[in-house]
Amino acid sequence: MIIFQDLISHNEMFSDIYKIWEITNGLCLEVEQKMLSKTTGNTDDSLIGRNSSSESTEDEVTESTIITSVDIVTNHHLQESIFTKEAYKKYIKDYMKSINEKLEEQRPERVKLFITGMKNKSSTSLLIFKTTSSLLVKT
C-alpha cells in the first residue's frame, strides 16, 4: 500500500486504496471519496452469547447512534477546517509559496509549470469555496 504524504508537513493524507486521478497536468491529485454510516451503541445479543429468552422478560431499550462521515476523513484522521474566504486565500497563498520553495530545491524544472498551473487552479478553488469543505491533516 502506498501512503501519500503532504510535501510540506509530511503528514499522511490518503493511500492508494482510493481511486486517484492526476489533474492540472499532474500538479494535483483528486481522490474519490465515499460516505460511510457507522452504528454505535446497539449490540446484537447473538454476538455476546446472550439468550434473551432465558434472562429478563422485560424489553430492554438500547440506544444506538448513527455516525456519517467521509471514508478518507475517517481512515486517515483528517480534520475539517473552517476558513473564511480571506483566511482561505491567505492559507493557500502561504502553502503554494512553501511548495514553490520545495520545488526550487528538489525539481527546479517544474517550477514554471507549477506557477502557471496553480494560478488557474487557485482561482477555480476560490469559485467553489462556498460549496466544498477543506480538509487538513491532523498534526
From Swiss-Prot:
<dbReference type="Pfam" id="PF00838">
    <property type="entry name" value="TCTP"/>
</dbReference>
<dbReference type="InterPro" id="IPR011057">
    <property type="entry name" value="Mss4-like_sf"/>
</dbReference>
<protein>
    <recommendedName>
        <fullName>Putative translationally-controlled tumor protein-like protein TPT1P8</fullName>
    </recommendedName>
</protein>
<feature type="region of interest" description="Disordered">
    <location>
        <begin position="40"/>
        <end position="60"/>
    </location>
</feature>
<dbReference type="InterPro" id="IPR018105">
    <property type="entry name" value="Translational_control_tumour_p"/>
</dbReference>
<comment type="similarity">
    <text>Belongs to the TCTP family.</text>
</comment>
<dbReference type="GO" id="GO:0006915">
    <property type="term" value="P:apoptotic process"/>
</dbReference>
<dbReference type="InterPro" id="IPR011323">
    <property type="entry name" value="Mss4/transl-control_tumour"/>
</dbReference>
<keyword id="KW-0053">Apoptosis</keyword>
<feature type="domain" description="TCTP">
    <location>
        <begin position="1"/>
        <end position="139"/>
    </location>
</feature>
<dbReference type="GO" id="GO:0005737">
    <property type="term" value="C:cytoplasm"/>
</dbReference>
<feature type="compositionally biased region" description="Polar residues">
    <location>
        <begin position="40"/>
        <end position="51"/>
    </location>
</feature>
<dbReference type="GO" id="GO:0005509">
    <property type="term" value="F:calcium ion binding"/>
</dbReference>
<dbReference type="InterPro" id="IPR034737">
    <property type="entry name" value="TCTP"/>
</dbReference>
